[in-house]
């Protein structure tokens, strides 16, 4: 089974899984890498997060002892889209590009995971979902807790 354009094989797929488990027609999970960084104010590099996550994921064990299975098989596989090129895109342009990247997959029955960089990148994915699901509630998981009290 040949992968369609816009999708990655085992070399760049989440977990490094091979066909047929990384094929988008079969997979129940889509990973959509959209690296973006423009408003970071301290240490730069959040735009490298999606590629670092994909690279590190190849070291993850497939078998989950608590579940007693290889979850990606239970889900039909995990397909990873080719990374969205956001070079030269700033703020609204990047948000619009990410929204356009994610929108075609919303409502398809796939579980979508969008890997961005900084906080702004999530807005495009959220807008894509909110356009289809107006009552959407968002829980955003950040790299840190942001639990420091205001001074």
Per-range role (PLM):
Residues 2-151:
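Conserved alpha-helical scaffold segments that buttress catalytic/binding sites
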């Amino acid at each position: 089974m040949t992968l369609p354009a816009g999708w990655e094989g085992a070399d760049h797929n989440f977990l490094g899984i091979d066909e047929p488990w990384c094929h988008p027609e079969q997979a129940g999970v889509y990973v959509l890498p959209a690296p973006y960084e423009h408003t970071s104010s301290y240490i730069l590099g959040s735009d490298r997060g999606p590629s670092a996550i994909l690279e590190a994921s190849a070291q993850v064990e497939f078998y989950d002892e608590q579940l007693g299975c290889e979850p990606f098989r239970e889900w039909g596989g995990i397909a990873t889209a080719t990374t969205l090129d956001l070079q030269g895109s700033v703020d609204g342009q990047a948000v619009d590009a990410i929204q356009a990247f994610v929108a075609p997959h919303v409502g398809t029955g796939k579980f979508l995971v969008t890997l961005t960089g900084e906080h702004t990148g999530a807005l495009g994915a959220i807008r894509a979902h909110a356009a289809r699901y107006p009552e959407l509630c968002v829980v955003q998981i950040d790299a840190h807790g942001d639990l420091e009290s205001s001074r």
